Amino acid sequence: MEFSVRAAELTTLLESRITNFYTNFQVDEIGRVVSVGDGIARVYGLNEIQAGEMVEFASGVKGIALNLENENVGIVVFGSDTAIKEGDLVKRTGSIVDVPAGKAMLGRVVDALGVPIDGRGALSDHERRRVEVKAPGIIERKSVHEPMQTGLKAVDSLVPIGRGQRELIIGDRQTGKTAIAIDTILNQKQMNSRATSESETLYCVYVAIGQKRSTVAQLVQILSEANALEYSILVAATASDPAPLQFLAPYSGCAMGEYFRDNGMHALIIYDDLSKQAVAYRQMSLLLRRPPGREAFPGDVFYLHSRLLERAAKRSDQTGAGSLTALPVIETQAGDVSAYIPTNVISITDGQICLETELFYRGIRPAINVGLSVSRVGSAAQLKAMKQVCGSLKLELAQYREVAAFAQFGSDLDAATQALLNRGARLTEVLKQPQYAPLPIEKQILVIYAAVNGFCDRMPLDKIPQYERDILTTIKPELLQSLKGGLTSERKIELEKFLKEKGGTYYI
């Protein structure tokens, strides 16, 4: 039987075939899971993969390639590995890990991959930034010269922090490390409300690493009650999250903070705490069979923290003059600051605030050891008035600590030593401060001026907090505001007259 096809039919058939011809083929490089366990998957067949590249498993779980070996690739899994089976397909994504960044992130709580976990829906307008980028070069930087005020008298007077600095907060558990960090965020509320331009506003990023979910929820509540969430981003990799997410969270938070730094704005990032990140990285490295070193940490644990903290910088005027200030937190064991991770981070940062359990239990809060705490670059950023006021403060406190140790052995002390002990006790009392009550810088200057110049010397110690509240509420607002501009001789006369009048009722 013969078939005859007319030319017109043939043309129509060919046209429809050509029209429906699909050319957009996608070629994926695929590997197979050889073994999986403890959050680590060994994959065979991904020969062209890059270090740090994201991959996707058949179950939809993502991972990152960390170990590139001859036979297979070591991949750490971002999530539960229970859905991954031997022989499953693994697909390259062709992209390095990135996270959302921008002002749309403000007020949100996200996980280490930038996915919102606060139940307020998806993120709106935002850009994406790589998690691992190089720190700014030498030419792009400028020396730190603007103050980053914490609202804490002990910090702003003795260990001042500048915008673009890295200041370590180190101490045992339950010594108030997180309290200092939270007070710093709360203090920016009044600073930002006074800001006249975007370049004066300071945005905050808080990275919670390995903390309890209840602790993070409590922090969100504190910040929202103080209306501080509107200029803050929270990145949470809690204790129940896999180690890879705890390892990644600081880098994700840093990428979000860098958006502000690179666009001529200012940001503060708090890593709470980097000890837990190092432990998570140690776990991953040992499971990837990398050789262990001191305290079983891998050899590149210094680089883990240095490449993160070097990204906090003050940019030059040519590159926008933005800044990223870092406050990393490290937890010590029984006050041992000579352990591996503490010494590493101390050597990377521009100074440290040391907190001690003994001071905390003696009621000196914040429990800052003034002798061990130091700020290597912050004094250049300190306000002129604060410099004038607290010039002798550190010396007097050092002399007080030295004499107080000897005073325990004998009571027959000369008048000069008695005066030194008396002044030191009052200075220590003045530097105490309740939690969640940061003070504006002009109020700090007033209180410290009163203590350093002997206006509290004749008062009982228990009356000093009351005296402090009294002078802060009754001083003329214009005199208080003028203190930020420096202490001229006229202002000093006016200030001393006011302090003498107020002090009379409190003297013994």
Swiss-Prot record:
GO biological process terms, semicolon-separated: proton motive force-driven ATP synthesis
| Principal location listed in the UniProt entry | mitochondrion
Q: What's an example of a GO molecular-function annotation for this chain?
A: ADP binding
Q: Which Pfam families match?
A: ATP-synt_ab (PF00006), ATP-synt_ab_C (PF00306), ATP-synt_ab_N (PF02874)
Top-level division of the source organism's lineage: Eukaryota
Q: Which GO terms describe its cellular component?
A: mitochondrial inner membrane; proton-transporting ATP synthase complex
List the residue(s) that the UniProt entry marks as the site Required for activity. Answer: S373
Keyword Electron transport in the entry? The reply is no
Q: Which InterPro entries match?
A: ATP_synth_asu-like_sf, ATP_synth_asu_C, ATP_synth_asu_C_sf, ATP_synth_F1_a_nt-bd_dom, ATP_synth_F1_asu, ATPase_a/bsu_AS, ATPase_F1/V1/A1_a/bsu_N, ATPase_F1/V1/A1_a/bsu_N_sf
List localization entries: Mitochondrion; Mitochondrion inner membrane
Q: Which UniProt keywords apply?
A: ATP synthesis, ATP-binding, CF(1), Hydrogen ion transport, Ion transport, Membrane, Mitochondrion, Mitochondrion inner membrane, Nucleotide-binding, Transport
The UniProt annotation places ATP binding at G171, D172, R173, Q174, T175, G176, K177, T178
HAMAP family documented for this protein? ATP_synth_alpha_bact (MF_01346)
How it assembles, according to the record, is: F-type ATPases have 2 components, CF(1) - the catalytic core - and CF(0) - the membrane proton channel. CF(1) has five subunits: alpha(3), beta(3), gamma(1), delta(1), epsilon(1). CF(0) has three main subunits: a, b and c.
Q: What does this protein do?
A: Mitochondrial membrane ATP synthase (F(1)F(0) ATP synthase or Complex V) produces ATP from ADP in the presence of a proton gradient across the membrane which is generated by electron transport complexes of the respiratory chain. F-type ATPases consist of two structural domains, F(1) - containing the extramembraneous catalytic core, and F(0) - containing the membrane proton channel, linked together by a central stalk and a peripheral stalk. During catalysis, ATP synthesis in the catalytic domain of F(1) is coupled via a rotary mechanism of the central stalk subunits to proton translocation.
Q: Which family does it belong to?
A: Belongs to the ATPase alpha/beta chains family.
Name assigned to this protein: ATP synthase subunit alpha, mitochondrial
Name the source organism.
Glycine max
